[in-house]
Curated annotation (Swiss-Prot):
Residues binding ATP: 183-190
Span list, region Disordered: 23-129, 453-490, 692-760
Example GO molecular function: RNA helicase activity
One cellular-component annotation, GO: nucleolus
Extent of motif DEAD box: 308-311
Protein name: ATP-dependent RNA helicase dbp7
Protein species of origin: Aspergillus oryzae (strain ATCC 42149 / RIB 40) (Yellow koji mold)
Domain of life: Eukaryota
Ranges annotated as biased composition (Polar residues): 58-72, 99-110, 731-740
Primary role: ATP-binding RNA helicase involved in the biogenesis of 60S ribosomal subunits and is required for the normal formation of 25S and 5.8S rRNAs.
Domain Helicase C-terminal positions: 396-609
Length: 760
């Protein structure tokens, strides 16, 4: 047959049209079925060349083969040592589980709308704690001796008494009955009980009153006995009372005063007691110890007992000590051989509020007490009732609150301090209150060690010698105890600011030196501290108080802002609140004002950041956001690159959260820890880790050394006792530990108090 020239073209794929079917043999029927399904699946979804082979957990497996997870590639991509992949693996290994969030994104908005300001001009309020202007109310007219009144005028520059001083002197100089002094903070309450006390003792020892010996000398001297005891809750307050008392006694040099407080050497205190004292200022724990163990302390002539800050004495758990002190004073009291000394003891209780614990303390110590208040005739019944239950703020104090998201807390505080100290002479001194000691240490390092990090990061290899010189200069300017340093974060060349820190975990001599340095400082300065500096301390020239962390109770808030606007001077206070349930705390703030809180103003984080980082230029709307973000990112890099500061930030973060949960029961709904965004809060401590991965085991860095020192001292005392020596220096328990134990016991009784973070 001839060829007809017909060509047939068939297009076939790469795979065979007919694939021979493999027949599986061996094994169980389940294994054969699984293998058959896998083969059918591969036939339907053929694998392209160069594609990774999918792994399956089914089918027969070779027991000698190591199984690899399906997420891991079959072969790693080979790159250079300096490639991107190698660098990313190194970064992930060095800093795992870090997330850099934006500073201005996903921040909660305030729940309460901003109130419109009133159109009527607000007149400046008259100071409520200022000295009286009336010329008739002088110290001489109230019963003080001319010598003491002249000393107040010439040496202390006090021309007229305050309202509470007038009321207390009118009562305590004439009668010997017990008294309860209630006055707002900053009204001169210390002099209200010290002036009558000193005047009564001076009257007894005055030569004109025939209280002299054959040589015409006063019969009252340091060996005459102890006449008065003043108890205060904290060591700092005892130191301040002692300083005021010493200044008063310069006009009566024959009257000797002294102090016994925790943290000092008992041997030196016993030596002072043996020499003789007429007025003693003490803390309850140390006085109870001396009454029990020191025979040189003779209290048979004590005729005046003052309990200053009575509410704080009860909150710290000193109820048992106070009961023991009062019982020992009653049991050891004897008739005095000195003419003019009262026959019975007068007890004076001082407190800013009349709470239940103060009433309980009054039942223990007072008998038929007289209630002393400033200007009771100028107040109606409703105002009196409100003052008894709540707290009062000085009328001249300008207070404001800022609604700041958790992310923006630290950068907003920095912006506010930048704006405050932008011009020289605007603000002299400021106090920043935080909740715990770890937070004090962290913020002190943030505000004072920034320059050191910048110098080291920029010129680490080229200018090491210059960096060492700068660091040595910085260290030379700082204090030897590490509590004073230049505030580089918010200082400027025209207005340098010094930074101080203070908390209860510092040794006593360091706390005293830091307080004295801050009080005597003539340059602009800032004190970052806990509530240890909130009670009774009269720090001069404090123009601004910032509550970075809200107080644990409304009473503590009153004492915090009471560090400014004292004795009629002007002052400002700012409290940071987060959006949400904390906004309800504004109603608590308004209760402290006589006008219902009309003078209370509101601001936002955006306004503070614009003024602090953006200046007064309105055209650059985004410049302040970029500057704030750069400052925050630089701070986070500083924390990541320095393990010491990173650990400090983590400790501060955890301690802050624990302290946040210790608000009193009546205010706990406003500070609900369940509504706290832990991730956003971590950013305010320069942390990039997830909250669940922030773990800092162990004690604070200083606690371990303190425990070692205490154990070594205890072992030394034990060896002395075995050898038959005296144990005058033996201290049964550490003051800080015992105070914390007493406070925890008190919390278990009431279940509505602040924890040890109030002490820190």
């Amino acid at each position: 047959m001839a060829d007809d020239g017909l060509l047939l073209n068939f297009s076939i794929g790469d795979t065979n049209i007919i694939k021979p079917e493999t027949k599986l043999k061996g094994g169980t029927w389940r294994d054969r079925l699984s293998a058959k399904k896998i083969a059918q699946h591969r036939t339907k979804n053929p694998r392209k060349p160069g594609e990774e082979r999918p792994s399956s957990g089914k089918g027969p497996q070779n027991p000698n083969r190591i199984q690899v997870s399906s997420s891991r590639p079959s072969k790693r991509q080979k790159t250079d040592a300096d490639g991107d992949n190698e660098k990313s693996r190194h970064d992930n290994k060095q800093h795992p589980r870090q997330f850099v969030s934006s500073l201005f994104s996903k921040n909660p908005t305030p729940r309460n709308a901003e109130e419109e300001p009133e159109q009527e001009p607000v007149e400046d309020a008259k100071p409520t704690n200022a000295p009286l202007i009336d010329g008739l109310d002088t110290f001489t007219n109230l019963g003080l001796s001319p010598s003491l009144a002249a000393h107040l005028l010439t040496k202390l520059e006090l021309k007229a008494p305050t309202g509470i001083q007038k009321a207390s002197m009118s009562q305590l100089l004439k009668e010997d009955s017990d008294a309860f002094i209630q006055a707002e903070t900053g009204s001169g309450k210390t002099l209200a009980y010290l002036l009558p006390l000193v005047q009564r003792i001076m009257t007894v020892s005055n030569p004109k009153n025939m209280s002299t010996n054959s040589k015409g000398e006063p019969i009252v001297h340091r060996d005459s006995g102890l006449f008065a005891i003043v108890l205060a809750p904290t060591r700092e307050l005892c130191k301040q009372i002692s300083v005021v008392l010493e200044s008063l006694l310069r006009c009566a040099h024959w009257i000797v005063a002294g102090t016994v407080i925790g943290g000092e050497k008992k041997k030196s205190e016993k030596a002072r007691l043996r020499k003789g004292l007429n007025i003693l200022v003490a803390t309850p724990g140390r006085l109870a110890d001396h009454l029990e163990n020191t025979q040189a302390l003779d209290v048979s002539n004590v005729r005046w007992l003052v309990l200053d800050e009575g509410d704080r004495l009860m909150e710290l758990g000193f109820e048992k000590e106070l009961q023991g002190i009062i019982q020992k004073l009653d049991a050891r009291q004897r008739p005095s051989r000195i003419p003019g000394i009262p026959t019975k003891r007068t007890t004076i209780l001082c407190s800013a509020t009349l709470k239940m614990n103060v009433q309980k303390l009054g039942e223990i110590s007072l008998k038929d007490a007289v209630h002393i208040k400033a200007d009771p005739a100028d107040e109606d019944g409703e105002t009196k009732r409100k003052d008894d239950d709540g707290f009062r703020v000085p009328a001249q104090l300008k207070q404001s609150y800022a609604i700041v998201a958790a992310k923006l807390r630290l950068v907003t505080l920095t912006a506010y301090l930048k704006r405050t100290f932008m011009r020289k002479g605007s603000v002299m001194k400021a106090i920043v209150f935080v909740s715990c000691a770890d937070s004090v240490d962290f913020h002190f390092e943030v505000f004072s060690r920034r320059k050191q990090y910048r110098d080291e990061s920029e010129d680490e290899d080229e200018e090491k010698e210059d960096d060492d010189e700068d660091n040595s200069k910085t260290k030379s300017e700082a204090s030897p105890h590490g509590t004073i340093a230049p505030a580089v974060a918010f200082s400027n060349p025209s207005n340098p600011v010094k930074l101080h820190k203070l908390h209860g975990s510092l040794p006593q001599h360091v706390r005293t030196a830091t307080l004295n340095a801050f009080s005597r400082e003539r340059e602009p300065s800032v004190l970052v501290c806990t509530d240890v500096a909130s009670r009774g301390l009269d720090l001069p020239n404090v123009d601004l108080v910032i509550e970075y962390d809200p107080a644990f109770s409304a009473d503590d808030h009153t004492h915090r802002i009471g560090r400014t606007a004292r004795l009629g001077r002007d002052g400002r206070a700012l409290i940071f609140l987060m959006p949400g349930c904390e906004e309800n705390y504004v109603e608590i703030l308004k209760q402290g004002y006589r006008d219902g809180g009309k003078a209370l103003t509101r601001t936002t984080a955006e306004d503070i950041l614009k003024r602090g980082f953006g200046g007064n230029i309105t055209s650059e709307t985004k410049n302040w956001e970029e500057k704030a973000t750069d400052w925050q990112m630089d701070l986070e890099r500083w924390a990541v690159d320095n393990p010491q500061y990173l650990e400090m930030a983590r400790r501060a973060y955890q301690s802050h959260i624990r302290a946040y949960a210790t608000h009193i029961a009546s205010e706990r709904s406003m500070f609900n820890i369940k509504e706290l965004h832990l991730g956003h809060l971590a950013k305010s401590f320069a942390l990039r880790d997830r909250p669940s991965k922030i773990n800092v085991p162990g004690l604070r860095p200083g606690d371990k050394e303190a425990k070692k020192d205490y154990k070594a001292e205890r072992n030394t005392v034990g060896k002395k006792r075995k050898a038959g020596g005296r144990d005058d220096d033996f201290q049964p328990s550490n003051d800080a530990t015992s105070a914390a134990q007493k406070m925890r016991a008190k919390l278990k009784e009431h279940m509505a108090g602040a924890s040890e973070f109030n002490l820190a």
